From Swiss-Prot:
Function in brief: Acts as a component of the essential kinetochore-associated NDC80 complex, which is required for chromosome segregation and spindle checkpoint activity.
Coiled coil, from the record: 24-124
Name listed for the protein in its UniProt record: Probable kinetochore protein SPC24
Subunit structure, as described in the record: Component of the NDC80 complex, which consists of NDC80, NUF2, SPC24 and SPC25.
Family: Belongs to the SPC24 family.
Main localization, broad class: nucleus
GO terms under cellular component: Ndc80 complex; nucleus
Keywords: Cell cycle, Cell division, Centromere, Chromosome, Coiled coil, Kinetochore, Mitosis, Nucleus
Disulfide bonds: none
GO biological process: cell division; sister chromatid biorientation
Length: 189
């Protein structure tokens, strides 16, 4: 207890336990480190705040773009639906299928008609050759050959000979020469 009663001794003993200069130096260094850490933390906080602002700005721009795209998509969807409703696509598809069937039927009908014409021509040719064999084998004269050639020429020009008049078959069968003329049609050629 004597130590407690002697304050000077107590101070000396306490001083001997601590190195005050070293502790003061350590405290100054700790304060300096704390200031540097505080400054570094403030810089990092400022950097992070700026980065957050940039990211929030980018996020807001992206959200605006997304909203615009959603709105555009909805408008296009409604426009497509309107066009589909106006066009009535299923009915158009049915109409197109029906037209294709009709075209195929017409094609078949035309093909059958062509086959009938070919068969009829073959029969007529066979009948003509049979008739030619049955007719007396008289030599065909030069005038007859000329007349046949003229008739073939008229036919190739879509012109027909009817009651001694040339008829233009391309224009509603009207006469090529006046009906009042009494000259021979063969003379016109």
């Amino acid at each position: 207890m004597s130590r407690l009663n002697d304050p000077v001794e107590l101070l000396q003993q306490t001083r001997s336990n601590f190195i005050i200069e070293s502790d003061v130096s350590n405290i100054k260094e700790i304060k300096s480190n704390m200031r540097q850490l505080t400054k570094l933390m403030a810089e990092k906080q400022t950097h992070h705040n700026e980065l957050m602002k940039q990211l929030q700005s980018q996020l807001q721009r992206q959200q605006t773009k997304v909203q615009a795209l959603k709105k555009n998509f909805q408008e296009q969807t409604s426009q497509v639906k309107r066009v589909e409703d106006e066009l009535n696509i299923p009915k158009l598809q049915q109409d197109i299928d029906k037209l294709v069937q009709e075209i195929n039927q017409l094609r078949d009908t035309i093909q059958e008609g062509i086959q009938k014409v070919v068969e009829t021509q073959k029969q007529l040719l066979n009948d003509d050759t049979d008739a030619a064999h049955t007719i007396d084998e008289e030599p065909i004269g030069k005038d007859d050959k000329i007349r046949v050639l003229k008739l073939k020429l008229f036919h190739s020009l879509d012109v027909a000979l009817y009651n001694d008049q040339l008829l233009d078959l391309r224009n509603e069968a009207r006469p090529l020469s006046s009906s009042s003329s009494s000259h021979n049609i063969w003379d016109e050629l």
